[in-house]
Amino acid sequence: MHFGQFNLMGYRERGTPTQRLFHEAREQTKLAEEAGFEIAWFAEHHFSNYCVCPSPLMMVAHCAAVTNRIKLAPAVVVMPLYSPARLIAEIGMADGLSDGRLILGIGSGYQPYEFERFGAELSSSKSQTEELMDMVELAFSKETFSYNGSHYQLPETHISAQPVNGMPEIWIAGDSEDIHKIAVKRGYTPMFAGRMHGVDYIVEQRNRLESSFKSAGKDTSELAFGVQRFLCVTESREETFQYLDNCRHQMRLASALRRREEVLNGAMMNEIPMPDEISLEEMSKHLLVGDVETIAERLTNEISKARPSHIMFHLQVGGSSYQLALKSIELFASEIKPLVEKVLGPLEEFGISTIEK
């Protein structure tokens, strides 16, 4: 299995320069490469402080110029918000600029607020995503192609910007049965967020994935999937709870956007407590926060029980410390991972990885 670093690029203080957030994401990506992380992930969201990155493919292209080895990936391209021909060409260009290091993370979207402002239909987003992926696969396997779907039509077309090694590896985000079915049918790697939950939730999601794959007659002994986890390495209780407060902030915004209950004051979303919200103290008991030994023990438990092929760490959340995020990357590589490997052995040999070297 392998590890990644996730960049949401949100902010909590009004007037935060977006340029700073882009630069901090870039520097975390560079450090993640030095620390041996396998993938750097970049989110896409629009129209609020929840996330200031409207184009993860632009972040891929930018970070490709300052890195050499690390894979670069949207998490995710919100497919129905794009014009098909332009999106496909930009995927090909991003892969070329990164010398074939693109992993294409896709999603169908979940925020009505975004879809309304793009004039897009959230109700048909999953079927739109499938049609768009039909077109991507045709564009990168044939010199020319045409398409006549329920949502999209394209006359005979050549996409000139082609990926280095043909079709990029595809990961798909979401925990619904519909997303599972797409992953099974197309051979994509599913990924989901662990949110504020502990290992039991991740195991439950793995079991749901296994059920979907088994229903389709697929072998689940080598099931590959990715999970996103919060990570903050510190011996300070104050820093731990400041970080957890920012995790809760981010989850509150996401929950409000999902439920269509967002309230904005200009660019800033108001924080609305989630239904059945757990306390920061409870969060501290099962998230990957705290000192090196605590995190290593919890991570070992999560890996051994849930057996993910990839874990992406969300290190800088809301208004949490950039410097603490950098420190956490370094301590994960130098101290936490070796402690986990003392118990589980070399993690590159543990479980299943879909990532090609």
Describe every region a protein language model picked out.
Residues 9-22, 77-85, 164-174, 232, ...:
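Active-site mouth loops of central-metabolism enzymes
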Residues 2-20, 80-146, 189-203:
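Flexible, glycine-rich active-site loops centered on histidine and acidic residues
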Residues 1-66, 70-72, 167-168, 350-356:
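N-terminal beta1-alpha1-beta2 module of alpha/beta enzyme domains
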Residues 124-159, 200-308, 341-357:
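An alpha-helical appendage that flanks or caps ligand/catalytic pockets
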